[in-house]
Design a protein with these regions (language model features):
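Glycine-rich phosphate-binding loops at beta-strand->alpha-helix junctions
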Residues: 59-65
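Short polar catalytic/cofactor-binding loops
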Residues: 14-18
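Short glycine-rich phosphate-binding loop at a beta-alpha junction
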Residues: 51-58
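Acyl-thioester C-C bond-transforming condensing/cleaving domain
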Residues: 2-8, 20-49, 66-67, 74-167
């Protein structure tokens, strides 16, 4: 192990506008928002996109998004398919966790340039129906994935707003 860690700096910080539920961003998928941000990070940082070693994105609501939305965002931003990209889901801390993970890989010298952040669109979180066992639809309930996967504590069964007040 080395006695000296690498110096880590942020070359560019970018975000999309904060939208409202079913507002002006309601039809833009999370991976598309992520792709826009990745392109702008590369533009502002003045580094060649071929120098990017890794992309780490935080996202909670992935139902119906297809495999690895972080990779979708990365490739659609024009990055090489050879650049690894992965998704972090640590609920409300997902974007921050991606930055911490990026920091760690840079600190240890595993990468030179890492793009990390978060991507989400709560307006596009689908309602799902468990219909695999061929039950009658009249007995099934739709599940709002925005609420169930993103906003309800899995252990205490209450809204994350209550969790915030309890913390």
């Amino acid at each position: 192990m080395t006695d000296k860690f690498n110096e880590v700096v942020i070359l560019a910080a970018v975000r999309t506008p904060i939208g409202t539920y079913n507002g002006s961003l309601k039809d833009i998928r999370a991976d598309q928002l992520g792709s826009i941000v990745i392109k702008e990070v590369i533009n502002r940082s003045n580094i060649d996109k071929e120098e990017i070693d890794e992309v780490i994105m935080g996202q909670i609501l992935t139902a119906g998004m297809g495999q690895n939305p972080a990779r979708q965002a990365s490739i659609n931003a024009g990055l090489s398919k050879s650049i690894p990209a992965y998704l972090v889901n640590q609920v409300c801390g997902s974007g921050l966790r991606s930055v911490i993970s990026g920091y760690q890989t840079l600190l240890l010298g595993e990468s030179k340039y890492v793009i990390c952040g978060g991507q989400e669109n709560m307006s596009l979180a689908p309602h799902v129906l468990n219909y695999k066992n061929e039950k009658k639809l009249s007995k099934e309930k739709l599940i709002d994935t925005m609420i169930y996967d993103g906003l309800i504590d899995a252990f205490n069964n209450y809204h994350m707003g209550v969790t915030a007040e309890n913390v």
